[in-house]
Amino acid sequence: SSDVCSSDLTTWQAIHHLFIASARAKILAKKIMPKAMLGAMYATSPSYPKTCHPDDQLAWMKQRRRLFYFSDVMLRGYYPSFARSFWDEYKVTIRMEENDEEILKEGTLDFYSFSCYRSTTIGKDDKLGIIALPFGENPYLKSTPWGWPIDPVSIRYVLNEVYDRYQKPIFIVENGLGEVDKPDENNFEIGRAHV
């Protein structure tokens, strides 16, 4: 399965422990370095509904929820309302310790950083995962030799979406092209378009 989570309780429980470890690290770091800002890096792939069909729109919305599952917990300090539906879908029950909710709330991250390489389209027939995204083609975009779309609008879309969601600083830490790197004017033009 391309979905790293599937119905494996061990994976889901490990993800919860990752959230707790991150929050505890943030709490400790603030004691040691009160002015420090801590964050995490997320692979953030912009996506569009494959068509305007309502079922494609619903599939797209579900995938956006999956995309933000990790950052919602780590930047907001609590599980989003849709988390329980994921757990039900995968037939898992997360075991939480008595003070886990307080730890998550106290240890929220200060910024969102992300990598962004390609956009995709999401349709009703695509297999949705927590980690893996389908690689749907967008007929409105040119592609690299690897078949990755060149989509400078998507970086703006992600910046707006993430800021609207968290109202915290954002850092773009990777914005690749998806082909063999070699200095040429085409790469510079694509970079300029993204800026």
What are these regions (language model features)?
Residues 1-192:
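Active-site region of glycoside hydrolase catalytic domains
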